Amino acid sequence: MINAGVTGASGRMGKLIIENIIKMEGIQLSSAFDLMNIGKDVGEVAQTGKLDVNISDVADMATVLKESKTNVVIDFTIAPATVANAPVVAGAGVDLIIGTTGFSDEQRATIEGAIIKNGTSAVISPNYSVGVNVFFKILQETAKYLSEYDIEIIEAHHNQKKDAPSGTAMKAAEVISETLGGKDFVYGREGLAPRDKEIGIHAVRGGDIVGDHTVLFAGDGERIEIKHQAHSRNAFASGAVKAAIWINNAGPGIHTMDDILGS
């Protein structure tokens, strides 16, 4: 049985992840962390029913991970929190599933450095839904055939999302750019902005949109639009818990959803 910890346990994604841990076989909740609701039963906070796992202060993470015999921590928080959590989790010899987005290059290096230094494993992905990772593969294939077309990415999310563009939009841009040997990214346009051989990236924020990503390949006289829509955050939570089960048999190092889907 895999013992899983959840950071941001009181949050929207934290609660969904806990629900999915309860539903899946081969994994159980062993620890939960947050800055609020400390000492409360996490099941009551998540409204899943009493689980006999209390929410712990993140300041006590190292001790709690050891005492609870946690094998893997699932982290969907914010970039500064994940950067602070990663060295603690890796230092305790515990694997990590990271769904946080919006990292700077320096923050990403800090996280990966902690994992490599401690010989643990991590899956780092901007999106854990199976559908969106198939979406990336479709974009890769399409770009091979439409390399001369203009490429624009439009993403839309709820009005509380903290980072823009989304990690998924950036991953889509990177996949296309790598396929085409490198492209500049342009974020929105204003004023006189003649188009060059670039990938345009645009962010929309409004209402309760879970996550829409559209990639437009536009040529003379025609265009192709490839779109992924998330109807529920449960697609992300379910994929993250499956990744936590998968990583139990993975070797040390940094892994992606490509590794999981390909195995």
From Swiss-Prot:
GO MF term set: 4-hydroxy-tetrahydrodipicolinate reductase; NAD binding; NADP binding; oxidoreductase activity, acting on CH or CH2 groups, NAD or NADP as acceptor
CDD domains listed in its UniProt record: DHDPR_N
Reaction(s) catalysed (UniProt annotation): (S)-2,3,4,5-tetrahydrodipicolinate + NAD(+) + H2O = (2S,4S)-4-hydroxy-2,3,4,5-tetrahydrodipicolinate + NADH + H(+); (S)-2,3,4,5-tetrahydrodipicolinate + NADP(+) + H2O = (2S,4S)-4-hydroxy-2,3,4,5-tetrahydrodipicolinate + NADPH + H(+)
Primary location group: cytoplasm
Residues that bind NAD(+): 8-13, 34, 99-101, 125-128
Pfam family, one: DapB_C
PROSITE patterns, A to Z: DAPB
GO annotation (BP), single: diaminopimelate biosynthetic process
Domain of life from the UniProt record: Archaea
SUPFAM superfamilies recorded: Glyceraldehyde-3-phosphate dehydrogenase-like, C-terminal domain (SSF55347), NAD(P)-binding Rossmann-fold domains (SSF51735)
A single cellular component GO annotation: cytoplasm
Pathway in which this enzyme or protein is active: Amino-acid biosynthesis; L-lysine biosynthesis via DAP pathway; (S)-tetrahydrodipicolinate from L-aspartate: step 4/4
Keywords: Amino-acid biosynthesis, Cytoplasm, Diaminopimelate biosynthesis, Lysine biosynthesis, NAD, NADP, Oxidoreductase
Localization per record: Cytoplasm
PANTHER family on file: 4-HYDROXY-TETRAHYDRODIPICOLINATE REDUCTASE 1, CHLOROPLASTIC-RELATED, DIHYDRODIPICOLINATE REDUCTASE
Family, as annotated: Belongs to the DapB family.
Protein name per its UniProtKB record: 4-hydroxy-tetrahydrodipicolinate reductase
